[in-house]
Amino acid sequence: MKVFCGRANPTTGSVEWLEEDEHYDYHQEIARSSYADMLHDKDRNMKYYQGIRAAVSRVKDRGQKALVLDIGTGTGLLSMMAVTAGADFCYAIEVFKPMADAAVKIVEKNGFSDKIKVINKHSTEVTVGPDGDMPCRANILITELFDTELIGEGALPSYEHAHRHLVQANCEAVPHRATVYAQLVESRRMWSWNKLFPIRVQTSRGERVIIPPLELERCPGAPSVCDIQLNQVSPADFTILSDVLPMFSVDFSKQVSSSAACHSRQFEPLVSGRAQVVLSWWDIEMDPEGKIKCTMAPSWAHSDPEELQWRDHWMQCVYFLPQEEPVVQGLALCLVAYHDDYCVWYSLQKTSPEKNGRVHPVRPVCDCQAHLLWNRPRFGEINDRNRTDQYIQALRTVLKPDSVCLCVSDGSLLSMLAYHLGVEQVFTIENSAVSHRLMKKIFKANHLEDKINIIEKRPELLTPADLEGKKVSLLLGEPFFTTSLLPWHNLYFWYVRTAVDQHLGPGAVVMPQAASLHVVVVEFRDLWRIRSPCGDCEGFDVHIMDDMIKRALDFRESKEAEPHPLWEYPCSSLSEPQQILTFDFRQPVPLQPIHAEGTIELRRCGRSHGAVLWMEYHLTADSTVSTGLLKSAEDEGDCCWNPHCKQAVYFFNTTLDPRAPPGSSQTVTYTVEFHPHTGDITMDFTLSDALDSGC
C-alpha cells in the first residue's frame, strides 16, 4: 500500500507530495538507529552478561525460579544471555513492532523460543495475571533504557511502573545502580555554543560593536542536552574548575520515583575562573557490590584510559549554566543537579538549596528566541571571529556607498555588517516568525531598528513595494538556513536568488558568487561501526538484525549520504580532496541537471569506509569559506573539519564488515548529479579493485 506524504524540500523551499511505502518511516527509523552501534559495544555487552549471570545465580542460590523481565529488549540479546545463564523464563518487551518481529526470529534462530516470550507492547501496557501477558511478577529486572543523559528515554517512569506492577519487591536488577557525575569547567569554546559574543567591526567611522540583546544575555538557553564525543574536545579548550562530583544515584532494584528532584554537592574550586559549563556523564553498576561497572567517563576521568570503549549511542553531556559565575579557588560553593522525569539541568549556588529554602526551578526554557532559531553549532559559527573577518573582508571588496543590499539567510548578522561597512540601504528577509522576532530584538539592542528593514515573507512573494521601489545591487547570503540537514541543502540560496531575479538591478553583485561540492575518501577510526554488520554478538547469532538494517538501508538510504559532525569522529583521508560540482550563483538555477562523473585516486593505504562530501562557498574570486576540510591533510592523512557544520558521509557498504579483508582498491569511481527541479543531489560511488595495491 502506498501513502502520500507532504514534505518541505529544504533545497527548493517548496512543499512536495511524495508517494511512499506505508512502512517508509519504519525503514527510516531502523536505518538511522543505533542498534548496530550497541551490538558492537563490547564493553557494554560483556558487562551486561556478567551482571546477568550474577543476578541469576543470586536468585538460584535462594532456591527460587529465575523469572526475567527484559524491558526494551531490542534484538533479544539480553534475554538470550539470561536464559544461557540459567534463567527459567524471560518476558522480553519491545514496543517497536519491526524490532519485536526481528527479536522473535533471532530468539527462534538461537533456539530459545521455549524460554523467551517477546511482547510487542510498551512496558506500561503489559499485564500480569492468569490471562495477562505474564502469569506472575518477575524477580529479575533487566533493562537498557538509557540515553546519553541517562533518563532522556523515559527510564524513570518505566522503572517506576515496573516496580509497582511487573516485578516482585526486592527483585534483582541489571543494572543495579546508576550514578551521574559532573565537573565544572570554564570554556570559551563551549560557552560560544550558548551565548552571542560581541562582534567588533572596524569601519571608516571608527569601531562599531554588535552586541546581544539583554534577553539573550539573561536567557537560560535551550532545554535540550548538548551531547557530544567529549574526548574530541581538546584539553586546551577548557579549564577544569572542580573535581569530578558524584551528583546522584538511582537504585534500580528498589522502587524508583520519576518525580522532580534536586541534588546538591558542596565543593571547593580547584582554581579561580569563570564557571560556565558543566560536563556530565554516568556509569552503571551491574551488581550490588559495584564490581561490574560500565562507565561513560571521558579519558581524563577514566580509571583506565587505555581501555576506553568507543560508542556513539552513549556519549557525554554538556550543560550550560544560566549565567557565567566567577569562582574563587578554595571558596566553597554548591553545584546543584535538578531532574524531572526526562531531563537534567544544573545551577551553581553559594549554599545548598536545603539551607537557603529555595524551591528548585522549573526546567530552563529559551525565552529570547535565539536558542529556538540557532542550534549550538550555529552559535559557534556566529561567534567564530576568523569566519566573521573573512565575510567582512569580502564585503569590503563588493560594497559601494550607494549599494542597496538584500540579505537572505536565517537569523544572519550579515545585514548588520553590511550596514556598518557603509551601504546606503539594507533589507533582510526573515520569513519565519521566530527569526523575525529575534532579528528585531538584535537590531533594537544595536539601535538599528530604523536602519535595517525586515521583510517577513517568502522570497518568491517579494514585491517592488517591499524594497521601496529600489533595485537590489548586492544580494547577500552566508548561506545558512535552519531547514538544512545536508551540506547542499543551503543551495536554497540559489533558488532564492532565482526567485528575486526580477528585483536585481543591472550589474548586481551576488555574494557568495558561487559554490562547489567537494569529496574525499576516508578511513574512519570508529564511525564505521554504526553501519557495520555484527554477525555474532557474545556468542549469539544476530545476522537477522544485520539483514534488517541492510534492507532498511537498501529501501532508501544505501545511495544517500547522511550528515555527521566529523570533528567528533576522527578519520584519515585516503585520497586528495576533489571538486566535483560547481554552482554559479551569478546566474539563475538552470533548467537542466548538472552532471559529473570521474575517478578518485587513493594515495594512502587503508580501509576505504566512505566518501565525505561538503560545500565550499566562494564569496568572491579570492575568498572561499569551507564547510568541510579546513586544511590539507597531514602526512598521516588526519583530517581537520569545520566544527560548526555537519559533513555528508556516503558509506561504502562493501568495506564496513570488519571480517572482510581490507581489499586492494586503488580508485573510486563516482557519478553525481544535481537535479534542479527537486534540488536533490544523487550519487553513486564504486570501489575499483587493483591487481596489486602495494599496501
Curated annotation (Swiss-Prot):
Disulfide bonds: none annotated. The gene is PRMT7. Its EC number is 2.1.1.321. Its main location: cytoplasm. The keyword Nucleus applies. It is found in: Cytoplasm, Cytosol; Nucleus. The active site is at 144, 153. CDD domains: AdoMet_MTases. Residues 14-345, 358-684 form the SAM-dependent MTase PRMT-type domain. SUPFAM superfamilies: S-adenosyl-L-methionine-dependent methyltransferases. GO terms for molecular function: histone H4R3 methyltransferase activity; histone methyltransferase activity; protein-arginine N-methyltransferase activity; protein-arginine omega-N monomethyltransferase activity; protein-arginine omega-N symmetric methyltransferase activity. This is Protein arginine N-methyltransferase 7. The modification Omega-N-methylarginine is found at residue 32. Homodimer and heterodimer. Interacts with CTCFL, PRMT5 and SNRPD3. Belongs to the class I-like SAM-binding methyltransferase superfamily. Protein arginine N-methyltransferase family. PRMT7 subfamily. It is an enzyme of class 2 (transferase). InterPro entries: Arg_MeTrfase, MeTrfase_PRMT7, PRMT_dom, SAM-dependent_MTases_sf. Arginine methyltransferase that can both catalyze the formation of omega-N monomethylarginine (MMA) and symmetrical dimethylarginine (sDMA), with a preference for the formation of MMA. Specifically mediates the symmetrical dimethylation of arginine residues in the small nuclear ribonucleoproteins Sm D1 (SNRPD1) and Sm D3 (SNRPD3); such methylation being required for the assembly and biogenesis of snRNP core particles. Specifically mediates the symmetric dimethylation of histone H4 'Arg-3' to form H4R3me2s. It catalyses: L-arginyl-[protein] + S-adenosyl-L-methionine = N(omega)-methyl-L-arginyl-[protein] + S-adenosyl-L-homocysteine + H(+). Keywords: Chromatin regulator, Cytoplasm, Differentiation, Methylation, Methyltransferase, Nucleus, Repeat, S-adenosyl-L-methionine, Transcription, Transcription regulation, Transferase. Pfam families: PrmA, PRMT_C. GO terms for cellular component: cytosol; nucleus. GO terms for biological process: chromatin remodeling; genomic imprinting; peptidyl-arginine methylation; regulation of DNA-templated transcription; spliceosomal snRNP assembly.
